[in-house]
């Protein structure tokens, strides 16, 4: 990216950033019905490699990590059209390119943003309990959920003089609770 002012290149804001992310995954699942119960368990393994490099500064990072993500669902049929379901899933949300790019960008001369090539992914454990009702032309799903996330990415701002410098950081946990009601009709 070239940034100019009065047809002059601003060297501090000209960047050649290389970002390479590779993910290899293997997934297996098993499901079974027994009476009014049905269930499914799954396991996904992922190997992630992220390389970043900012030309001219030599700044970059190399991250390699192996993760295992279990899932499980248990259904119970109350009647032919009513079910309850409990589920668990572990998830990952990797930082995106713009969060990891280590160069500065700005909207004005008082607010400078910098990426963080050392960001880690966010991991979430998701628990759900649902009631489902099916009919000929649709269904309704009422769900209560709890999601616990670690290494949550937040922007951290430091003020030096009259200039604000913002940078994303892995900063703490997040606990989300909620209720969803979804109706689908044809």
PLM region spans:
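Outer-membrane beta-barrel proteins
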Residues: 17, 55-65, 116-120, 170-172
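Outer-membrane beta-barrel pore domains and translocons
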Residues: 33, 44-48, 75, 89-91, ...
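Outer-membrane beta-barrel architecture
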Residues: 27-29, 71-73, 118, 128-130, ...
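Surface-exposed extracellular loop regions of Gram-negative outer-membrane beta-barrel proteins
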Residues: 21-58, 65-71, 80-126, 146-169
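Transmembrane beta-strands of outer-membrane beta-barrel proteins
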Residues: 1, 39-43, 70, 84-86, ...
